[in-house]
A protein has these predicted regions:
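Short beta-strand scaffold segments in enzyme catalytic cores
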Residues: 13-19, 136-138, 144-148
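N-terminal beta-alpha supersecondary unit
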Residues: 2-85, 114
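A contiguous, well-structured pocket-lining segment that forms one wall/lid of small-molecule binding clefts
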Residues: 189-196, 209-210, 214-290, 300-313, ...
Length: 359
């Protein structure tokens, strides 16, 4: 089966062509047109600008994906498109384009949930697929949640953030300490410098950082976003607000502070919160596989820490490659395949939705 997938939920216009056979998925092409440079001028995504950019890019991106895959539309057996959640104007561009393409060429159409797509990015690696039931977490600029994946199309939310997403908090604090939007990669590097400075070692385990004098420095205290109420939930707004107040105090008092050590402390609290809740989730649900996906899954400190948690719990960890952690269409095609074989085809009346309807 040859699959054409389209993604336009936020600030990347993406198209991909996948093939699926008895050996699994093959990504024949994956094209992403990023709007980062445009939105960087505003410090974040401007929805109207994003929608207009999608309109300008979607046809060319799809054509390039088909050309690189060396296929024509007559070779395509299935069209998949992100239909929710996301920016409504951005989603509508992809949905309407995919609907027109599918209808004009009499190809079945499947609507895909963006978060299910992120988790499906883990199905595109070389390792065996995680077998349901398994535990998955989606960590991005808009989502922070744990899911019990009962089948490749049936998900149950078992933990979530009650306010801000982990990626949004990194972007906000990153901007305040001079890291350009999106802050993820820059924050990762700066925190790495801070961890090395605090421990005297490159890529030191976070357990070593916790023993350092830098961690014991009370002037850099930040609270954990892991809620201590027996749930698998988070509150990243508390961590973010505490960090903002700390930065304001430094500024008002004319105090110098080490940006790298600050980034390390913030990263430590965010990563350890995810690790703590992952440990709790794995003890609560008897699974053999764990998937970590979404843009924040590219964070090197988080990847290493969750690998430690998975190893200790005796479960297999599946993390998409770095190129598939961010928004892309290949992941949408992978999830779309499973929706299709489950009989979840979309009608011509398909509409986009900004709301998250993963369950």
């Amino acid at each position: 089966m040859n699959i054409l997938a389209i993604e336009s939920s936020c600030d990347e216009t993406a198209a991909a062509v996948l093939a699926h056979d008895e050996d699994g998925f093959s990504v024949l092409s994956s094209i992403v047109a990023s709007q980062i440079e445009t939105h960087r001028l505003y410090g974040g995504v401007v929805p109207e600008i994003a929608s207009r950019a999608h309109i300008e890019a979607v046809n060319a991106v799809t054509y390039e994906a088909m050309e690189r895959a060396a296929l024509s539309l007559s070779d395509i057996d299935l069209v998949c498109v992100t239909a929710q959640p996301g920016l409504i104007g951005a989603l509508l561009v992809g949905v309407n384009f995919a609907k027109s393409l599918a209808a004009a060429n009499k190809i079945p159409l499947v609507a895909v949930d963006h978060i299910k797509g992120h988790i499906a990015a883990a199905y595109l690696g070389e390792s065996p697929l995680p077998e349901p039931p398994f535990l998955a977490m989606a960590l991005s600029g808009g989502h922070t949640a744990f899911y019990l994946v009962k089948s490749y199309t049936e998900f149950e939310i078992v933990g979530t953030t009650r306010d801000d997403a982990i990626g949004e908090s990194f972007d906000k604090i990153g901007r305040l300490i001079g890291i350009p939007y999106p802050a993820g990669a820059g924050f990762d590097r700066l925190a790495g410098e801070g961890f090395a400075k605090a421990t005297g070692r490159e890529n030191a385990p976070l357990s070593l950082y916790k023993k350092s004098e830098a961690y014991k420095d009370k002037t850099m205290y930040l609270p954990s976003p892991a809620l201590a109420d027996g749930s698998l939930d988070f509150s990243f707004s508390g961590l973010k607000t505490a960090a903002i107040n700390l930065l304001h105090r430094f500024e008002q008092n004319g105090e110098d502070f080490d940006r790298a050590l600050f980034a390390a402390r913030y990263t430590y609290e965010a990563v350890e919160a995810v690790a703590k809740k992952t440990e709790e989730a794995l003890s609560r649900y008897q699974v053999t596989s764990l998937v970590m996906a979404g843009g924040v899954a590219a964070n090197s400190h988080l990847r290493r820490r969750i690998a430690e948690v998975a190893k200790k719990a005796g479960v297999t960890l599946h993390i998409p490659s770095l190129s598939l952690c961010g928004d892309n269409a290949a992941m949408i095609g992978a999830q779309g395949y499973y929706e299709y074989i489950a009989g979840h085809t979309a009608a011509s009346s398909l509409n986009a939705s900004a709301a998250d309807s993963i369950v």
